[in-house]
Protein backbone atom coordinates (compact mmCIF):
# COMPACT_ATOMS: atom_id res chain seq x y z
CA UNK A 1 0.00 0.00 0.00
CA UNK A 2 1.27 3.45 -0.97
CA UNK A 3 0.45 6.81 0.63
CA UNK A 4 -1.51 7.91 -2.44
CA UNK A 5 -3.69 4.78 -2.16
CA UNK A 6 -4.99 5.69 1.32
CA UNK A 7 -8.73 6.29 1.42
CA UNK A 8 -11.03 7.17 4.32
CA UNK A 9 -13.17 4.35 5.72
CA UNK A 10 -16.45 3.88 3.82
CA UNK A 11 -19.20 6.03 5.33
CA UNK A 12 -16.81 8.18 7.38
CA UNK A 13 -16.87 11.10 4.93
CA UNK A 14 -20.36 12.46 4.34
CA UNK A 15 -21.22 15.33 1.99
CA UNK A 16 -22.64 18.43 3.64
CA UNK A 17 -26.33 19.08 2.87
CA UNK A 18 -26.33 22.47 1.09
CA UNK A 19 -29.85 23.84 1.36
CA UNK A 20 -31.51 26.75 -0.42
CA UNK A 21 -29.33 26.46 -3.55
CA UNK A 22 -31.93 26.00 -6.29
CA UNK A 23 -34.79 23.62 -7.03
CA UNK A 24 -32.72 21.09 -8.93
CA UNK A 25 -30.55 20.45 -5.87
CA UNK A 26 -33.55 18.82 -4.19
CA UNK A 27 -33.09 21.07 -1.16
CA UNK A 28 -34.11 24.43 -2.63
CA UNK A 29 -37.12 26.68 -1.95
CA UNK A 30 -38.17 25.66 1.58
CA UNK A 31 -34.72 24.27 2.43
CA UNK A 32 -36.10 21.02 3.93
CA UNK A 33 -38.23 22.94 6.46
CA UNK A 34 -41.66 22.25 4.96
CA UNK A 35 -44.32 24.95 4.51
CA UNK A 36 -44.96 27.74 7.04
CA UNK A 37 -45.51 26.95 10.70
CA UNK A 38 -43.34 27.42 13.76
CA UNK A 39 -40.55 25.12 12.61
CA UNK A 40 -40.19 26.91 9.24
CA UNK A 41 -39.46 30.26 10.91
CA UNK A 42 -36.05 31.51 11.93
CA UNK A 43 -35.68 31.01 15.66
CA UNK A 44 -38.64 28.65 15.46
CA UNK A 45 -39.03 25.91 18.01
CA UNK A 46 -39.85 25.74 21.68
CA UNK A 47 -37.68 26.58 24.67
CA UNK A 48 -36.06 23.72 26.60
CA UNK A 49 -38.52 22.17 29.03
CA UNK A 50 -41.65 23.35 27.17
CA UNK A 51 -44.18 20.52 26.88
CA UNK A 52 -46.80 22.00 24.58
CA UNK A 53 -48.71 23.83 27.30
CA UNK A 54 -49.20 20.94 29.73
CA UNK A 55 -47.69 21.42 33.19
CA UNK A 56 -43.97 20.75 32.70
CA UNK A 57 -42.15 18.06 34.65
CA UNK A 58 -40.06 20.62 36.52
CA UNK A 59 -43.24 22.17 37.95
CA UNK A 60 -45.12 18.89 38.54
CA UNK A 61 -42.49 17.61 40.95
CA UNK A 62 -42.69 18.97 44.52
CA UNK A 63 -40.01 21.27 45.90
CA UNK A 64 -37.71 19.75 48.50
CA UNK A 65 -35.00 20.95 50.86
CA UNK A 66 -33.21 24.26 51.20
CA UNK A 67 -29.72 25.79 51.18
CA UNK A 68 -28.48 26.29 54.72
CA UNK A 69 -26.73 29.68 54.66
CA UNK A 70 -25.14 28.96 58.06
CA UNK A 71 -23.50 25.70 56.96
CA UNK A 72 -19.85 25.38 57.96
CA UNK A 73 -17.57 24.31 55.10
CA UNK A 74 -14.12 22.97 55.97
CA UNK A 75 -11.27 21.56 53.90
CA UNK A 76 -10.87 18.08 55.38
CA UNK A 77 -7.46 16.49 55.95
CA UNK A 78 -6.89 13.06 57.52
CA UNK A 79 -4.04 12.52 60.00
CA UNK A 80 -2.41 10.01 57.61
CA UNK A 81 -1.61 12.97 55.32
CA UNK A 82 0.35 14.66 58.15
CA UNK A 83 2.78 11.73 58.35
CA UNK A 84 4.96 13.35 55.64
CA UNK A 85 6.02 16.23 57.95
CA UNK A 86 9.04 16.11 60.28
CA UNK A 87 8.78 16.01 64.10
CA UNK A 88 7.92 19.33 65.85
CA UNK A 89 6.58 20.89 62.63
CA UNK A 90 3.86 23.50 63.21
CA UNK A 91 0.99 22.49 60.91
CA UNK A 92 -1.10 25.45 59.72
CA UNK A 93 -3.61 25.74 56.86
CA UNK A 94 -1.08 27.88 54.96
CA UNK A 95 1.63 25.20 55.31
CA UNK A 96 -0.79 22.48 54.11
CA UNK A 97 -1.58 24.61 51.06
CA UNK A 98 2.09 25.37 50.37
CA UNK A 99 3.06 21.68 50.64
CA UNK A 100 0.10 20.75 48.37
CA UNK A 101 -1.58 18.53 50.94
CA UNK A 102 -4.73 20.54 50.13
CA UNK A 103 -5.62 22.44 46.97
CA UNK A 104 -7.60 25.26 48.63
CA UNK A 105 -8.70 26.50 52.04
CA UNK A 106 -12.51 26.55 52.32
CA UNK A 107 -14.25 29.58 53.88
CA UNK A 108 -14.35 28.12 57.42
CA UNK A 109 -10.78 26.79 57.32
CA UNK A 110 -9.30 23.31 57.75
CA UNK A 111 -10.58 20.35 59.77
CA UNK A 112 -8.33 17.43 60.69
CA UNK A 113 -10.03 14.01 60.61
CA UNK A 114 -8.86 10.77 62.20
CA UNK A 115 -8.33 8.29 59.34
CA UNK A 116 -4.95 6.58 59.30
CA UNK A 117 -2.05 6.42 61.74
CA UNK A 118 0.30 9.14 62.96
CA UNK A 119 3.75 8.50 64.46
CA UNK A 120 5.24 12.01 64.20
CA UNK A 121 5.16 14.58 67.04
CA UNK A 122 3.40 17.60 65.47
CA UNK A 123 1.94 20.90 66.62
CA UNK A 124 -1.37 21.29 64.76
CA UNK A 125 -2.93 24.78 64.53
CA UNK A 126 -6.19 24.54 62.57
CA UNK A 127 -9.82 25.70 62.83
CA UNK A 128 -11.35 22.33 63.81
CA UNK A 129 -10.18 18.86 64.84
CA UNK A 130 -12.27 15.70 65.21
CA UNK A 131 -12.14 13.81 68.52
CA UNK A 132 -10.40 10.79 66.93
CA UNK A 133 -7.78 12.98 65.25
CA UNK A 134 -7.11 14.85 68.51
CA UNK A 135 -6.48 11.55 70.34
CA UNK A 136 -4.08 10.31 67.63
CA UNK A 137 -2.11 13.58 67.52
CA UNK A 138 -1.80 13.73 71.32
CA UNK A 139 -0.99 10.00 71.56
CA UNK A 140 2.00 10.54 69.26
CA UNK A 141 3.25 13.34 71.54
CA UNK A 142 1.89 16.27 69.54
CA UNK A 143 -0.30 19.24 70.47
CA UNK A 144 -3.57 20.54 69.05
CA UNK A 145 -4.37 24.26 69.02
CA UNK A 146 -7.73 25.36 67.64
CA UNK A 147 -7.39 28.81 66.04
From Swiss-Prot:
One of its GO terms (biological process) is translation. GO terms for molecular function: rRNA binding; structural constituent of ribosome. The keyword Ribonucleoprotein applies. Gene3D superfamilies: 3.100.10.10. Keywords: Ribonucleoprotein, Ribosomal protein, RNA-binding, rRNA-binding. Residues 42-52 have a biased composition (Gly residues). SUPFAM superfamilies: Ribosomal proteins L15p and L18e. Belongs to the universal ribosomal protein uL15 family. Part of the 50S ribosomal subunit. HAMAP family: Ribosomal_uL15. Binds to the 23S rRNA. This is Large ribosomal subunit protein uL15.
Amino acid sequence: MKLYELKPAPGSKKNRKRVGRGESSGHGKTSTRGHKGQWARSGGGVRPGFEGGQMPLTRRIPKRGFKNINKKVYTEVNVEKLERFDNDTVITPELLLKERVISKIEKDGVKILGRGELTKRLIVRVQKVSEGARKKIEASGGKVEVI
